[in-house]
A protein has these predicted regions:
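Non-catalytic beta/alpha edge segments that cap or flank active sites
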Residues: 1-98
Length: 98
């Protein structure tokens, strides 16, 4: 498995524990993904500042934690989609030009 997407559990409610669960098994966090998802989402809703979206490496897989609202998940994924192929290539040790 090279890419794992989660939806939901990234808000501020006490039941929202997805980021903590992923951090427990991650070997590295990729803060840029969460930063971009929040920055771009802020253009749509000011409540995006409450989001705890993140991306991390688990084994050799990229895990991206998206919001639970379907439209928010699609939007957030679109904000980071351009970086996903390169990240997966690096994790899978595919030779690249950079």
């Amino acid at each position: 498995m090279q890419l794992i997407l989660t939806t939901g559990g990234t808000g501020v409610a006490l039941r929202d524990v997805t980021p903590e669960a992923v951090r427990e098994i991650a070997i590295r966090e990729l803060p840029g993904f969460g930063e971009i998802m929040r920055i771009e989402s802020m253009k749509i809703t000011k409540n995006a500042i409450l989001s705890r979206n993140l991306a991390a490496i688990v084994d050799k897989a990229l895990v991206i934690c998206l919001p639970g609202k379907p439209s928010g998940a699609v939007e957030c994924l679109s904000f980071v989609a351009g970086a996903i192929p390169h990240c997966i290539e690096v994790l899978q040790e595919v030779p690249t030009s950079c």
